[in-house]
């Protein structure tokens, strides 16, 4: 879809005129509480959407203006990037190249943090979604070229740009490049490196089957109005004068999903569609104090997730790589003590809910989880290394994050699973 001439002309309006347009989207003073005014929102928005409150808009603005270091490999300097800056530069460059961006959204854990920072989950990656048309291979290549070219704008002053090529920038600053092009999924991802794990992830989406695992990570916040306000208005934001920002839940019901986030509830729709990583996210949520909704068929949910995990990651080497990467991303630094609890929880779920595996394959995965749990236990310090510590999870599946109990060293860390003599039927 090419931008129309009239659309280009509208971008060239005088700042004062555009500022007036931005002001028309300003939310007047509303409730100063942490949650959106759902009653007011329902008048003009669907159930899957809601307007953000003033405190939420402030958190969003602060998040988009917080400088994030993009660490270079080798001798390349560290780039200091504000998320709103890179969004504006990339979007403008895409439009100049004839690729129209329908909207830009904040997705995932960062969006959940903006809506309810007291969930205890925090956020790592900053997921920025550009909704656009990607109908050809050329459009995929052009988005990658645009992002790499934009990185030049963020190099520190004094750095010679003459001999820096796009390939050089990719090797220096890109953590991950992904392209998915199927009948149902057309999107690409460029993840920019950050040593602390807070990667800036630019995702260019034409279509995708599913963008969430549970209701609490289904939120997207549309950034267009806030970005336009920052560009066009010289008046600082206030409770009485700020842009109207809309949030959306891909789960379907915004109010219900927000309530799940506030009360630490695990809920989802069509669990059979959850990808393999959903099993790790589920165990992560259990360790953080989240609990399945009472009406949930927990055994069925766990069976779906276990089955999908082994479909997506059948090889033990790949399983280990995925587990280690997830633990490093979500339980690094001060959170490292929770790795043991997460692995014990994962062992329990896999032990209870895995079907469609030969007994030796199942045992192989359980042994891998046991070994990683032992490593995590040893990393907690000399006291934990002195004995193998084990405590069965309670009825709610909770395992303490730190070890302050001891048992005879001869007792195994994790209970040995019952072996199954032959192939288990898939239900």
Curated annotation (Swiss-Prot):
Subcellular localization: Cytoplasm; Nucleus
Listed InterPro entries: TET5
Ranges of compositional bias, category Low complexity: 15-30
First-listed, main subcellular location of the protein, grouped into a coarse class: cytoplasm
GO BP terms: mRNA stabilization; negative regulation of apoptotic process; negative regulation of cell cycle; negative regulation of cell population proliferation; positive regulation of translation
SMART domains in UniProt: DUF1693
GO cellular component: cytoplasm; nucleus
Keyword NAD: no
Reactions it catalyzes: RNA(n) + ATP = RNA(n)-3'-adenine ribonucleotide + diphosphate
Region described as Disordered: 1-46
Protein function: Catalyzes the transfer of one adenosine molecule from an ATP to an mRNA poly(A) tail bearing a 3'-OH terminal group in an ATP hydrolysis-dependent manner. May be involved in maintaining the translation efficiency of at least some genes through preventing degradation of their mRNAs. Prefers RNA molecules that are adenosine-rich close to 3'-end. In addition, may inhibit cell proliferation and cell cycle progression through ubiquitination of beta-catenin/CTNNB1.
Name of the molecule in the record: Terminal nucleotidyltransferase 5B
Lineage of producing organism: Eukaryota, Metazoa, Chordata, Craniata, Vertebrata
């Amino acid at each position: 879809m090419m931008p129309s001439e009239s659309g280009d002309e509208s971008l060239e309006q005088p700042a004062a005129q555009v500022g007036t347009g931005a002001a028309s989207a300003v939310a007047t003073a509303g409730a100063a509480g942490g949650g959106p005014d759902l009653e007011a929102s329902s008048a003009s928005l669907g159930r899957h959407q809601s307007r953000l409150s003033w405190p939420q808009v402030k958190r969003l603005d602060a998040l988009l203006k917080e400088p994030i270091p993009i660490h270079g490999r080798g001798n390349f300097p560290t780039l200091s990037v504000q998320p709103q800056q890179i969004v504006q530069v990339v979007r403008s460059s895409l439009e100049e190249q004839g690729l129209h961006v329908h909207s830009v959204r904040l997705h995932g854990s960062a969006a959940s943090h903006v809506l309810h920072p007291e969930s205890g989950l925090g956020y790592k990656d900053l997921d920025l979604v550009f909704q656009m048309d990607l109908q050809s291979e050329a459009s995929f290549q052009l988005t990658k070229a645009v992002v790499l070219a934009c990185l030049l704008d963020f190099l520190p002053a004094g750095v010679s740009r003459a001999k820096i090529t796009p390939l050089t920038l990719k090797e220096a600053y890109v953590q991950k490049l992904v392209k998915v092009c199927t009948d149902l999924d057309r999107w690409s991802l460029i993840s920019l490196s950050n040593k602390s794990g807070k990667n800036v992830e630019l995702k260019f989406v034409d279509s995708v089957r599913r963008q969430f695992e549970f209701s609490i990570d289904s939120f997207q916040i549309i950034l267009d109005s806030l970005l336009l306000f920052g560009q066009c208005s010289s008046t600082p934001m206030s409770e009485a004068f700020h842009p109207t920002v809309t949030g959306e839940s891909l789960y379907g019901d915004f109010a219900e999903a927000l309530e799940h986030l506030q009360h630490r509830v695990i809920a989802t729709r069509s669990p059979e569609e959850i990808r393999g990583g959903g099993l790790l996210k589920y165990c992560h949520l259990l360790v953080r104090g989240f609990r399945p909704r009472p009406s949930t068929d927990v055994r069925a949910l766990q069976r779906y997730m276990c089955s999908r995990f082994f479909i997506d990651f059948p090889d033990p080497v790949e399983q280990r790589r995925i587990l280690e990467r997830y633990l490093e991303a979500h339980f690094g630094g001060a959170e490292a003590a929770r790795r043991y609890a997460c692995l014990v929880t994962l062992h329990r779920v896999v032990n209870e809910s895995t079907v469609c595996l030969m007994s030796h394959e199942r045992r192989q995965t359980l042994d891998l989880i046991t070994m990683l749990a032992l490593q995590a236990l040893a990393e907690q310090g000399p006291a934990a290394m002195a004995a193998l510590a084990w405590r069965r999870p309670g009825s709610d599946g909770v395992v303490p994050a730190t070890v302050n109990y001891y048992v005879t060293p001869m007792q195994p860390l994790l209970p040995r699973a019952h072996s199954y003599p032959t192939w288990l039927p898939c239900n």
